[in-house]
Amino acid sequence: GLKEIFKAGLGSLVKGIAAHVAN
């Protein structure tokens, strides 16, 4: 559903930010 898509997108965004901060 839409919530799953939103959660997946949010998780991806958080991972991207975390990776950016770690570097």
Curated annotation (Swiss-Prot):
Gene Ontology CC, one term: extracellular region
Residues where Asparagine amide occurs? 23
Q: Which GO terms describe its biological process?
A: defense response to bacterium; innate immune response
Q: Report whether Membrane shows up as a keyword of the record.
A: yes
Which locations, inside or outside the cell, does it occupy? Answer: Secreted; Target cell membrane
Tell me where it mainly resides.
Answer: secreted
Q: Which domain of life is it from?
A: Eukaryota
Q: Which terms are listed as keywords in the entry?
A: Amidation, Amphibian defense peptide, Antibiotic, Antimicrobial, Immunity, Innate immunity, Membrane, Secreted, Target cell membrane, Target membrane
- Summarize tissue expression: Expressed by the skin glands.
Q: Which family does it belong to?
A: Belongs to the frog skin active peptide (FSAP) family. Alyteserin-1 subfamily.
Give the function comment from the record: Antibacterial peptide with amphipathic alpha-helical structure. Shows selective growth inhibitory activity against the Gram-negative bacteria E.coli (MIC=25 uM). Has a weak hemolytic activity against human erythrocytes (LC(50)=200 uM). Is not active against S.aureus (MIC=200 uM).
Q: What is this protein called?
A: Alyteserin-1b
